[in-house]
Design a protein with these regions (language model features):
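N-terminal chloroplast transit peptides
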Residues: 1-20
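Hydrophobic anchor at the beta1->P-loop junction of P-loop NTPases
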Residues: 53
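Conserved lysine of the Walker
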Residues: 61
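ATP-dependent small-molecule kinase phosphotransfer cores
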Residues: 78-137, 178
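A glycine- and Lys/Arg-enriched "phosphate-lid" helix/loop adjacent to the NTP-binding pocket
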Residues: 140-186
Length: 255
């Protein structure tokens, strides 16, 4: 009887790099599409209300702001970029030439202009919370604080370049961040929402993850009946009463 050798197993086909790349791109596209849909849904609930990102230096407000605006279909504005566009000087240059007080005055003027717009994600400077009058403008929208561990923020700032940060010139980065946080913490806590960056690695959570966290927090916030009513309802007759005991406003219409 003739023995038959078993048929050789088929050799597995090798997966080309181009195929792997296509699969990865498809997965990324699906994730981006899902984030886009969720972002637009949150934007619809906000009914035009702008989002202001606040936080200490190194929290990635500019990068996160641009990505969040894209997901929501909003326009992205950056107060530092607007200041540079108007003055033709960087914030660091203005700090050096004018001092912090004058810089904050310029920053407040820019914020007052920006706060008049709707459907915007606004990335703000780290110290914008220091001026009490700025909160009147910040409260025109939803304020989201980005928060991370000091060591993570220091690594980001060092990677970006200390020379861009006028308040870091005189001492170590971590020590300075700690002092700034100590001075500003009570103001940052006034934010409507706080979103953690995470510290799983040196870079913190990826931008897409941070965007998901922001959208989730915004969705939960605006879904509350009281907040939704506040955002949507306009004043009705009788909601606002104007008193004029001295008659300085003149006769009433149709009087």
């Amino acid at each position: 009887m003739r023995a038959f050798a078993p048929a050789p197993c088929a050799r597995p086909r090798s997966v080309s790099r181009s195929t792997t790349r296509r699969v990865a791109l498809a997965a990324a596209a699906d994730a981006t599409s899902a984030q886009y849909l969720r972002g637009r849904a949150v934007a619809d609930k906000l009914v035009g209300t702008s989002v202001f990102l606040i936080g200490i230096m190194g929290t990635g407000k500019s990068t996160v702001g641009a990505a969040l605006a894209k997901a929501m279909g909003y326009k992205h504005l950056d107060t530092d970029e607007l200041i540079q566009g108007v003055t033709k000087k960087t914030p660091a240059e203005l700090f050096a030439e004018l001092g912090e007080s004058e810089f904050r005055a310029i920053e407040s003027l820019i914020l007052a202009e920006v706060a008049a717009y709707k459907n915007c994600v606004v990335s703000t400077g780290g110290g914008i919370v220091c001026e009490r009058t700025n909160w009147m403008h910040l409260h025109n929208g939803v304020t989201v604080r980005l928060h991370g561990e000091n060591e993570l923020l220091a690594k980001r700032v060092l990677a970006d370049g200390v020379e861009k940060r006028p308040l870091l010139a005189s001492e170590g980065v971590v020590a300075r961040i700690e002092k700034l946080l100590e001075a500003r913490e009570s103001m940052y806590k006034q934010a409507d929402l706080t979103v953690p960056l995470g510290s799983r690695d040196d870079a913190g959570a990826p931008v897409d993850v941070v965007i998901d966290r922001i959208l989730e927090a915004l969705d939960a916030r605006v879904s509350e009946d009281a907040v939704q009513s506040k955002l949507k309802n306009e004043p009705k007759d009788g909601d606002i009463t104007v008193t004029d005991p001295r008659g300085e406003l003149g006769p009433k219409p149709n009087a």
